[in-house]
Amino acid sequence: MSKSALDPVEFLKGALEIPSPSGKERLVAEYLAEGMQKLGLKGFVDEADNARGQVGEGPVQVVLLGHIDTVPGQIPVRLEGGRLFGRGAVDAKGPFVAMIFAAAGLSEEARKRLTVHLVGATEEEAPSSKGARFVAPRLKPHYAVIGEPSGWEGITLGYKGRLLVKARREKDHFHSAHHEPNAAEELISYFVAIKAWAEAMNVGQRPFDQVQYTLRDFRVHPAELRQVAEMFFDLRLPPRLPPEEAIRHLTAYAPPTIELEFFGREVPYQGPKDTPLTRAFRQAIRKAGGRPVFKLKTGTSDMNVLAPHWPVPMVAYGPGDSTLDHTPYEHVEVAEFLKGIEVLRGALEALAQTHAGEKEG
């Protein structure tokens, strides 16, 4: 059991008080690693600035990975009316700290059957996903849990994929009286065509199976002799439309005069409902007094990055309401956070029982 009586709420509060926008996670990683050491875990910071921990010496390898970077924009950290406010309370320092305390509370029997690897990953909120990509080839789990808010009774089975697109049109400048579309108008026409294609793809589909599109930026660069227009948009992709297939469609709709660049290429993922891991979570949620609910998310997470590398049972789980992600009033209910720790610990104990009697090798 844990060597220190660290209070989980106060420990999370301390993590929230350390700003950690993507690319600047080192200080919070050191704080979390030190806390893991105080709780009796092996704790350290790796070369990607991930906060890492390990407990147990069993043959069954379990990865608990949540991200410790946040979007920009600090929120005054405060405990108010049973709610803990702060950037990252939900997305996703809260879920990762819950993972730390769940692992620290494991029984000796569970520690003999499992080796639990904790990863507080960096740059999840950036296109790089630096932390997840660093550990992907270095860890070989039998099970993986991604720390993202699902609500303490929720089990997330999948996330949509994502494709980032830059479109550019450059052409000779001409007088506005000419009956010819300018560079900006050509890009607008292209985006309208993409919207029409996506809407046709979405007919009769539930939200998780729809293609979502968002125009992120549109720029027109003034020039005397050449017109230059650029736009940036992203697509959220359902499992039936992997990034390379989406690129084929986007390229087909683009006139040859429009230059396209593609980034991200996160593969959509949806895991099965019935695995030893989902059964362990369902059991733990019921034991804590809840009713398990499976969820599919229209966003993306490190699950999209890791699923192609780790073909093992994988879910996302964490306390918190995901509708509060990135908002100026992000907070987690303290009772919800503590329930999340209870469920995570219970799921690990149940998983250990599933593998009772197994030997190394």
Swiss-Prot record:
The record lists Zn(2+) 2 as bound by D91, E125, H326
This protein's pathway reads: Amino-acid biosynthesis; L-lysine biosynthesis via AAA pathway; L-lysine from L-alpha-aminoadipate (Thermus route): step 5/5
> Would the keyword Signal turn up in this protein's UniProt record?
no
Keyword tags: Amino-acid biosynthesis, Cobalt, Cytoplasm, Hydrolase, Lysine biosynthesis, Metal-binding, Zinc
Cofactor(s) needed, names only, are:
Zn(2+); Co(2+)
The note describing how and how many cofactors are bound reads: Binds 2 Zn(2+) or Co(2+) ions per subunit.
Binding of Zn(2+) 1 occurs at H67, D91, E148
E.C. no = 3.5.1.130
User: Which molecular function term from Gene Ontology is one that the record holds?
Assistant: cobalt ion binding
> What is this enzyme's catalytic activity, as reactions?
[amino-group carrier protein]-C-terminal-gamma-(L-lysyl)-L-glutamate + H2O = [amino-group carrier protein]-C-terminal-L-glutamate + L-lysine
Q: Which InterPro entries match?
A: LysK, Peptidase_M20, Peptidase_M20A
- Reply yes or no: does the keyword Repressor apply: no
Active-site residues? D69, E124 (proton acceptor)
Bridged cysteine pairs (disulfide):
none
Q: Name one GO biological process term.
A: lysine biosynthetic process via aminoadipic acid
Compartments where located:
Cytoplasm
Tell me which GO cellular component terms the UniProt record holds. cytoplasm
| Principal location | cytoplasm
Q: How does it assemble?
A: Homotetramer and homooctamer.
What family, per the record?
A: Belongs to the peptidase M20A family. LysK subfamily.
Function according to Swiss-Prot or TrEMBL: Catalyzes the release of L-lysine from [LysW]-gamma-L-lysine. In vitro, can deacetylate both N(2)-acetyl-L-lysine and N(2)-acetyl-L-ornithine.
Name assigned to this protein: [LysW]-lysine hydrolase
Q: What is the organism field in this record?
A: Thermus thermophilus (strain ATCC BAA-163 / DSM 7039 / HB27)
